[in-house]
């Protein structure tokens, strides 16, 4: 528990009461605090790290105060330079009526990445769900990570 206290404010889950009276029971070593987590539904499993981990993230869909509603999208991870936020790229085709053909287009999205997803790298495919606005540019949360299969450069349509 001491390793997560790196911020100036005390890090704790707001739904867990930590000040249980231990005078009558006697101090029996360091007990592990209970952890709040939830099943977000929609067929997504709660990661093992969210249940057993010690991180505190109020914007996590599994352990925080964020509900997933609205759109479910997928994209490819392109940048990981922010703290707990990644940039994903969504490719799509746009029809040009004059030439009766399609052109490639893409959009970049900033997405909140919970600490329960540890092994995420550039090129992985992530499934994201819409939530309330978490910051100026972040409106989606990572729900599932799929490892990149091959290193073949190609246009991927989601």
Swiss-Prot record:
Belongs to the universal ribosomal protein uS17 family. Pfam families: Ribosomal_S17, Ribosomal_S17_N. Citrullinated by PADI4. GO terms for molecular function: rRNA binding; structural constituent of ribosome. The modification N-acetylalanine is found at residue 2. Gene3D superfamilies: 2.40.50.1000. One of its GO terms (cellular component) is cytosolic small ribosomal subunit. GO terms for biological process: ribosomal small subunit biogenesis; translation. This is Small ribosomal subunit protein uS17. The modification Citrulline is found at residue 22. The keyword Ribosomal protein applies. Keywords: Acetylation, Citrullination, Cytoplasm, Lipoprotein, Methylation, Nucleus, Palmitate, Phosphoprotein, Ribonucleoprotein, Ribosomal protein, RNA-binding, rRNA-binding. It comes from the Eukaryota. It is found in: Cytoplasm; Nucleus, Nucleolus. The modification Omega-N-methylarginine is found at residue 69. A lipid is attached at residue 60 (S-palmitoyl cysteine). The modification N6-acetyllysine is found at residues 38, 45, 58. Its main location: cytoplasm. The modification Phosphoserine is found at residues 67, 110.
């Amino acid at each position: 528990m001491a390793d997560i206290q790196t911020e100036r404010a005390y890090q704790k889950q707001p739904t867990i009461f930590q000040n249980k009276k231990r005078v009558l029971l006697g101090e029996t070593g360091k007990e592990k605090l209970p952890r709040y987590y939830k099943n977000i539904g929609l067929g997504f499993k709660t990661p093992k790290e969210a249940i057993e981990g010690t991180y505190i993230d109020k914007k996590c869909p599994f352990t925080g105060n964020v509900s997933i509603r609205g759109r479910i999208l997928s994209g490819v991870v392109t940048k990981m330079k922010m703290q707990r936020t990644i940039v994903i790229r969504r490719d799509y085709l746009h029809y040009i009526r004059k030439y009766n053909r399609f052109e490639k287009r893409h959009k970049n999205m900033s997405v909140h990445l919970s600490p329960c997803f540890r092994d995420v790298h550039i090129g992985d495919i992530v499934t994201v769900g819409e939530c309330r606005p978490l910051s100026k540019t972040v409106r989606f949360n990572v729900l599932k990570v799929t490892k990149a299969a091959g290193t073949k450069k190609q246009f991927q349509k989601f």
